[in-house]
UniProtKB/Swiss-Prot annotation:
InterPro entries in the record: PBP_GOBP_sf
The keyword Lipid biosynthesis is annotated on this UniProt entry: no
Coiled-coil portions: none
Tissue distribution of the protein: Female salivary gland.
Main location: secreted
Entry's family note: Belongs to the PBP/GOBP family.
Role this protein plays: Inhibits contact coagulation pathway activation in the host by sequestering anionic polymers, such as dextran sulfate and heparin, and thus blocking interaction of protein components of the pathway with negatively charged surfaces. Inhibits dextran sulfate-mediated autoactivation of host coagulation factor XII (F12). Inhibits dextran sulfate-mediated activation of host factor XI (F11) by activated F12. Inhibits polyphosphate-induced plasma extravasation at the injection site in mouse model, probably via inhibition of bradykinin generation in host skin.
Encoding gene per record: K03
Listed GO MF terms: molecular sequestering activity; odorant binding; toxin activity
Cystine pairs: C27-C44, C40-C108, C91-C117
Protein name: Salivary protein 15b
Amino acid sequence: MKYLGLALISAVFLIGTCQAETPSQKCEEKYKENAERKACIHHCKYQYYGFIDVNYNIAQPEIRKFSNVLMDYGVVDRSKKRELKKVMHDCAKKIKKEARTGDHWLNCRTSIDYYRCVLTSKLIGPQRFDKAIQDYDKTISV
């Protein structure tokens, strides 16, 4: 009887963690019925990761979070931190400028364009990048 409360609390936490979804699962489920908004899956995931904010902005906190994940998961060596942040900052500026002059302001395409810009940098290997993002996705429960 002494351990009944502890057992119940443990069961509740176990059930909660078993039902948790990753950002990938949550975002794919959210947009699977809407073909026009499938481009937003990427933005949705990046928002959960903290790489882009809800208003499609990419500022210092988002760049810091993204660069830390890439370094933590071995995509970019820590000795190239300054170079990586410069690439990310330049990409963010470029994407914002293109969005202002194009027919779209900041929208779901913004995060896709930003992702592509960062990925085409010589600092980043696409295979390691994708694996790092997938591994990071598994560490987050929503």
